[in-house]
């Protein structure tokens, strides 16, 4: 009976692992999903409870800052007070424990679209008015890959209490700034989006103790979204492949 060479065994095993890994990731991160990262903002934060009330579709500049955060458009606050949680380049730090001591990372998860939470209080969007805004304000970033089958304009709908900013490939698409009750804001890309994969980011924050809500959906048919694999997921597969390689080498050593 013909036996496979040990090197062939190792090659086939590793190849099979590489082929199957993307399918395993796809199961965990199915279409119409986004990754969500939660933050809570201390009630004592200088921006908490002081930015009411306004609606502004010009609250932030067109692109993200060097730290990957929304950048305030000075004078675009719609008549309300300007935020104080700013870096030198006017990046807003409500989503950055690194740059804001009042912000704390509290967890991650996967959400499906359309997403709707009319009680988006801390902790992690599961609280209520009585136990959420009384101590912390809620912030979150939804992120993932948006896949367009053809080159086209893409339409979204958002509704937020208080603010939400949607970016595609780092450029603003939906700007629902200001502290206000939940309002529905339809928005569409300023120009055609090329077919293929694009980076989607949704920045949400609640800063006033009277309500917290977020709704987000993609209106254009044929568009899919998927949660970007977390580094821990990729590390899992990397560790598994190394372990598999070690196992096969040990088998080769015993058979030699």
Question: Which sequence ranges carry the predicted segments?
Answer:
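A short, hydrophobic C-terminal helix/tail in secreted or cell-surface proteins
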Residues: 229-248
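Short, charged juxtamembrane terminal tails flanking transmembrane helices
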Residues: 252-256
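Acidic/polar, compositionally biased interaction segments
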Residues: 31-227
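Short, low-complexity interaction segments enriched in Ser/Thr/Pro/Gly
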Residues: 9, 248-251
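Bacterial N-terminal signal peptides that target proteins for export
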Residues: 2-14
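Sec/Tat signal peptide C-region and signal peptidase I cleavage site
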Residues: 23-30
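Bacterial N-terminal signal peptides
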Residues: 13-22
